[in-house]
Amino acid sequence: MSRRSQRLTRYSQGDDDGSSSSGGSSVAGSQSTLFKDSPLRTLKRKSSNMKRLSPAPQLGPSSDAHTSYYSESLVHESWFPPRSSLEELHGDANWGEDLRVRRRRGTGGSESSRASGLVGRKATEDFLGSSSGYSSEDDYVGYSDVDQQSSSSRLRSAVSRAGSLLWMVATSPGRLFRLLYWWAGTTWYRLTTAASLLDVFVLTRRFSSLKTFLWFLLPLLLLTCLTYGAWYFYPYGLQTFHPALVSWWAAKDSRRPDEGWEARDSSPHFQAEQRVMSRVHSLERRLEALAAEFSSNWQKEAMRLERLELRQGAPGQGGGGGLSHEDTLALLEGLVSRREAALKEDFRRETAARIQEELSALRAEHQQDSEDLFKKIVRASQESEARIQQLKSEWQSMTQESFQESSVKELRRLEDQLAGLQQELAALALKQSSVAEEVGLLPQQIQAVRDDVESQFPAWISQFLARGGGGRVGLLQREEMQAQLRELESKILTHVAEMQGKSAREAAASLSLTLQKEGVIGVTEEQVHHIVKQALQRYSEDRIGLADYALESGGASVISTRCSETYETKTALLSLFGIPLWYHSQSPRVILQPDVHPGNCWAFQGPQGFAVVRLSARIRPTAVTLEHVPKALSPNSTISSAPKDFAIFGFDEDLQQEGTLLGKFTYDQDGEPIQTFHFQAPTMATYQVVELRILTNWGHPEYTCIYRFRVHGEPAH
């Protein structure tokens, strides 16, 4: 029979003896049940086994160490696997560790001391236990304080475990912090990855309630992870970091002088302790191997993380201290910014691809239209050639006589028309020469009138002085007379120019009427060029041909403190994590800029608003122009946001509260996009500050848009 079979037989016999007695063999019996029962039954029977120590005799000062070690063995036993696993561990070669190795660990001394006191303990137990299994109270006189010592031993065991934890933190904090940093880094990396996914797929959408729930759930999950980690590592899980320190602390506690207790220890109990200690040492070796492997894996992960940080451009962290909170936030911001840049780049590529596809479609459509038009032109040219060939054949089929007669008649008619035109041109030339002679005589007539006035002026002065005696008050100065003469001269020249233009227009009208009567319909090439030139000139003159003194590039500006509040749109142009950062809106400056296209306008709340403009120069206002986009360019073919009734006020200075009303006008939404309104006042003062006050619009309930506002007039100097 092997030694292992003998030990199992001895434990079975000890268990049977312990079940029939209630005295001194209770300790051995309870200890044997720890290895016969399952771990679950061991935990349930732990309290009862400890209570059975109460009738034990006084074992001397070393009993505390034994009780503490026994309690610690019970605690370690609760973490052991079932009996099959223990037998496998027992059969391993590592369980047969030499006593010298255990002495190096700090446990060999206690084992040898227990081995030396084996005979004494057996004899003492035989003395205390009776053959019938019962014992007398007289045998246990002086042993009433065992319960107090067992409670103190449990407290001492808890203190020893706490001391081992503190000793591990004090001696090797690097490993503890590396493990904690690895666990926190992995958790944080997963959280940042989840946050990036939330930013892309959830937070960019406008789910306010879901976003609030996720922001609440994120710290809750973090708190749950921290709580689980604290529960997992306290109090026994922390022993897995450095089991050698825990065993050293327990061995140090067990090396106290225990001569009296060793005399009472039984042989089966000692062998059970030896077996448990050997298994504990084997587990310690395996845990140390696992810790070494875990440390190497952690170092590999740390090196990989550092390479990743260097690759991503993040500043490297020296040593093994880990990343701080600010560095982690910086890494998170870097990841988010890179993700955002990648999304923007993808959006730009998709937009460019879509625009390219639309351009390709437009090119294809344009090419198709061009091909269709070319086919139509070719078809029309072929039809024309066929018609010409038909006319040629018809003309060749006509007789020569009929052709000559018709040709002679047509030539006569054309000669008559040409003669009439020559006569009309001669009459027109005569009229033009007469008008030119009259225009040429005008300076002579003006000079004659001037000479006559100058010749008669002294006589008039003498007559005026001779009349009434002291009438010097009514004298005219020379400057006033010259001003009146210049005014008379300008009036005469203006009248002559009007007469000349009127005569030219009458001649052109009569000529066109004559040509229409004679059957000549159409315009000449010179007239077409003249019309096109006039149209291009009018377009180059800002489409109205009037100087704009409210142009921002010319020096005008908007007094923003005296304008209505700008209407803000509800759609954010830029947002971060679903939070709007910037809304798109135009300032009142846009009404002074010539860039007019749909949407580029200044909008204010409601149908009523105002804007005050400082002109580029002090002028005498003559007209204002209001411009809006046409209905054809509007997406819904309506311009209900256009102003309808408005008024113009003039201010002498910027700080003036109420201005002078210059006029009230109405913008027609069915008219031209650019509408000019002239002031009706015969005399107008000079102003440099003008207010545009919108009274109503064309029906939009939320806002009113102004695209461009112009002011025309004459300079004050």
Curated annotation (Swiss-Prot):
Location of Phosphothreonine modifications: T107
Cystine pairings recorded for this chain: C601-C705
Location(s) in or outside the cell: Nucleus inner membrane; Nucleus envelope; Endosome membrane
GO biological process, one term: nuclear migration
Topology versus the membrane: Single-pass type II membrane protein
Main location (coarse class): nucleus
Segments passing through the bilayer: 213-233
Known glycosylation sites: N636
Residue numbers spanned by region Sufficient for interaction with SYNE1 and SYNE2: 507-717
Gene Ontology MF terms: cytoskeleton-nuclear membrane anchor activity; identical protein binding; lamin binding; microtubule binding; protein-membrane adaptor activity
Keyword terms, alphabetized: Coiled coil, Disulfide bond, Endosome, Glycoprotein, Meiosis, Membrane, Nucleus, Phosphoprotein, Signal-anchor, Transmembrane, Transmembrane helix
Outcome (variant: A603E): Decreases interaction with SYNE2. Disrupts interaction with SYNE2
Region (Disordered), start-end ranges: 1-66
Tissue spec: Widely expressed. Highly expressed in heart, lung and muscle. Weakly expressed in fetal heart. Slightly overexpressed in some heart tissues form patients with congenital heart defects.
Functional description taken from the UniProt entry: As a component of the LINC (LInker of Nucleoskeleton and Cytoskeleton) complex, involved in the connection between the nuclear lamina and the cytoskeleton. The nucleocytoplasmic interactions established by the LINC complex play an important role in the transmission of mechanical forces across the nuclear envelope and in nuclear movement and positioning. Specifically, SYNE2 and SUN2 assemble in arrays of transmembrane actin-associated nuclear (TAN) lines which are bound to F-actin cables and couple the nucleus to retrograde actin flow during actin-dependent nuclear movement.
Description of how the protein assembles with itself and partners: Core component of the LINC complex which is composed of inner nuclear membrane SUN domain-containing proteins coupled to outer nuclear membrane KASH domain-containing nesprins. SUN and KASH domain-containing proteins seem to bind each other promiscuously; however, differentially expression of LINC complex constituents is giving rise to specific assemblies. At least SUN1/2-containing core LINC complexes are proposed to be hexameric composed of three protomers of each KASH and SUN domain-containing protein.
PANTHER family per record: SAD1/UNC-84-LIKE PROTEIN-RELATED, SUN DOMAIN-CONTAINING PROTEIN 2
Name the record gives this protein: SUN domain-containing protein 2
Species of origin: Homo sapiens
